[in-house]
């Protein structure tokens, strides 16, 4: 993400309202693309369903199918996301760009084989029709490639191309959905599901073309990145735990008193799910601000501080640079939290007026969920920002600890909330997010209190190469590929 912040700094140097809006738009799409796209498409399709007079059962099933597919794909890709990002950073630093595209297809292969097998088994027994099941599986595969490509696109500086891929996915989905349902009279559920699938497919195609434009094709091993998973295993679990903490409360609510069996294995809680989707949009201000403000202003100080260790800086300069870096960090984190507080307060104040404009049938219970989850997502956004700063300082233990506690606290808190009145269901996630924020903040304060020792004293004297199951898997796949090539030559 540091590369993104560095490049965005160039955009923000340009004067004018439109230049500023464009930079914020680029940052928003790059950093929140997966969930933002999913939420916008679901809300938009629900609005179109309302205009089309679709039955409530069809609307609920459409939301369930897209939500299940979205959450499953994000969870599957979350384990590789951070190690792959670290692999990309190392390869770009070492000017080994020829390894990037092979690793993209290698990671896609593993994710698609494992993910599609598991999700396919679920769909077989889910009660979905053959057409619905095939569309869900197709959408799942596209989402996996899209989310994986977003990790790789952090190294691409063509922000206009990324933005157009995002806009194309939304435009094609809505346009095709309108054409199929309103003009051709296709079934509402299958028509909108097909439209969303085609939209994600176009986004996948555009993102893949961008990657091929910037990185060369080569015959390098597509499994090299697996060694980075072993080396940075805490990063893999940090990504997984963060996603589990973010989504577990939704699944638990589906099994609670307000959950309904929509069809077969598809369960949902429409009152809670729609409120959660819209509340999630309230954290965009913090997610974008992290890149635009924290990284753009903090990263130069961070780089100057660590360069003093690498270039033989004197003690006085190191102490001064540390004080300046931490002062900028504290200021930017304070402003980030303040902006999220104002954004949450504004959304809660205006939600009655704004939500009444959408034909989503909001009632008092949904308004309550929305307000509670806005606060919860706001705390999560700030906590996640602090956790990312821990990763900046290579405090992988602190990051995985904070994310693990977040996943456990959000899940346990949601389970406990089920024993209370339905109006309190969102407070379980809110409590988990509050614990996440406090723990990450305390860990950051503790870690930075002795930063020179962390930089110098905790480094291994002799370089160590970690080898585990993923390295063994890489060796096995490489040998299998070599045997296949030798057999083909014979």
Spell out what each predicted region is:
Residues 92-104, 273-356:
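Specific pore-lining/lateral-gate transmembrane helices of multi-pass inner-membrane transport
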Residues 195-199, 203-295:
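Transmembrane helical elements of multi-pass membrane transporters/channels
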Residues 165-212, 423-445:
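Hydrophobic alpha-helical transmembrane segments
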Residues 153-179, 390-412:
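Alpha-helical transmembrane segments of multi-pass membrane transporters/permeases
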Residues 63-89, 243, 247, 276-301:
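Small-residue-rich midsections of specific transmembrane alpha-helices
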Residues 1-41, 60, 64, 226-235, ...:
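N-terminal membrane topogenesis motif
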Residues 67-72, 108-113, 121-153, 163, ...:
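Alpha-helical transmembrane segments of multi-pass membrane proteins
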Residues 20-36, 163, 221-248, 333-342, ...:
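Hydrophobic faces of transmembrane alpha-helices in multi-pass small-molecule transporters and flippases
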């Amino acid at each position: 993400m540091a590369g993104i912040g560095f490049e965005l700094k160039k955009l923000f140097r340009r004067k004018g309202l439109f230049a500023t809006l464009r930079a914020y738009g680029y940052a928003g799409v790059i950093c929140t693309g997966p969930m933002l796209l999913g939420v916008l498409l679901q809300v938009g399709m629900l609005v179109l369903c309302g205009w089309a007079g679709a039955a409530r059962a069809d609307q609920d099933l459409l939301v369930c199918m897209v939500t299940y597919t979205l959450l499953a794909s994000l969870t599957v890709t979350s384990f590789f996301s951070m190690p792959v990002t670290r692999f990309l950073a190392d390869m770009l630093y070492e000017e080994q760009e020829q390894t990037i595209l092979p690793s993209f297809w290698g990671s896609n292969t593993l994710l698609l084989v494992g993910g599609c097998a598991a999700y396919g088994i679920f769909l077989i027994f889910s009660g979905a029709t053959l057409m619905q099941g095939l569309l869900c599986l197709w959408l799942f595969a596209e989402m996996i490639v899209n989310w994986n490509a977003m990790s790789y696109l952090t190294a691409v500086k063509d922000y206009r191309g990324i933005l157009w891929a995002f806009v194309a996915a939304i435009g094609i989905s809505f346009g095709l959905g309108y054409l199929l349902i309103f003009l051709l009279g296709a079934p509402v559920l299958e028509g909108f599901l097909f439209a969303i699938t085609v939209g994600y497919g176009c986004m996948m195609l555009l993102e893949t073309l961008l990657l091929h434009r910037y990185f060369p094709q080569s015959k390098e091993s597509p499994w090299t990145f697996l060694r980075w998973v072993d080396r940075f295993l805490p990063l893999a679990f940090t990504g997984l735990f963060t996603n589990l903490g973010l989504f577990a409360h939704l699944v638990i609510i589906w099994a609670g008193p307000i959950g309904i069996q929509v069809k077969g294995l598809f369960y949902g809680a429409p009152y809670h799910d729609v409120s959660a989707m819209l509340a999630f949009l309230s954290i965009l201000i913090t997610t974008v601000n992290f890149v635009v403000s924290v990284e753009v202003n903090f990263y130069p100080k961070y780089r100057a501080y660590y360069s003093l260790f690498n270039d033989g800086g004197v003690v006085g300069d190191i102490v001064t640079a540390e004080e300046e870096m931490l002062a900028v960090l504290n200021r930017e984190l304070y402003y980030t939290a303040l902006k999220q507080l104002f954004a949450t307060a504004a959304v809660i104040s205006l939600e009655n007026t704004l939500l009444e404009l959408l034909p989503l049938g909001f009632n008092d219970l949904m308004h309550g969920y929305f307000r509670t989850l806005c606060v919860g997502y706001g705390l999560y956004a700030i906590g996640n920002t602090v956790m990312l700063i821990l990763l900046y300082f290579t405090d992988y233990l602190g990051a995985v600890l904070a994310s693990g506690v977040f996943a456990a606290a959000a899940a346990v808190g949601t389970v406990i909330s089920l024993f209370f009145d339905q109006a309190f269901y969102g407070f379980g996630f809110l409590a988990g997010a509050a614990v996440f924020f406090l723990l990450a903040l305390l860990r950051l304060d503790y870690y930075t209190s002795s930063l020179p020792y962390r930089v110098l004293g905790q480094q291994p004297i002799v370089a160590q190469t970690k080898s585990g199951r993923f390295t063994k898997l890489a060796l096995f796949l490489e040998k299998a590929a070599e045997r296949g090539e030798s057999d083909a030559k014979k």
